Amino acid sequence: MVKTEEMLNNLEELINTPSVVGFYPEIHKKLAEMVGKFGYELEFDNKRTAYVRVPGKDSSKIVCVGAHLDTIGMQVRHVMDNGWIEVKNLGGVNFHNVEGENVYIHTRSGKTYEGMVICKSHSTHVFDDARSRERDKFNEA
């Protein structure tokens, strides 16, 4: 029997766990805890792809169900003197789609900062080039 509320809670917890491309420790820990509740163990290959083996009634056939644990994101490359940040695109961010999005910056020291992606010319009533300025890593912060 499917426990819908528990399944939705688990899904929400996974979705809200930071897991930008190449940054898997938190999502792997969370997934290991979840599958552990069912008596299973999380395994990894050399690329850190996670697997859970669930024995079936007929072990002569193997079924693999896959899903992404990571998401697209950005990596901070440099903090400029004026406080703006220079980012590197991870996994295919389309800068036209992320303007105005809330973001979290996770540091090597374990701190997390909350911010927002904005374009350098973000308002048409203030910046003449707001409609024409390219939305890319050089004009977003």
Where are these regions (language model features)?
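N-terminal hydrophobic/helix-forming segments and targeting peptides
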Residues: 1-141
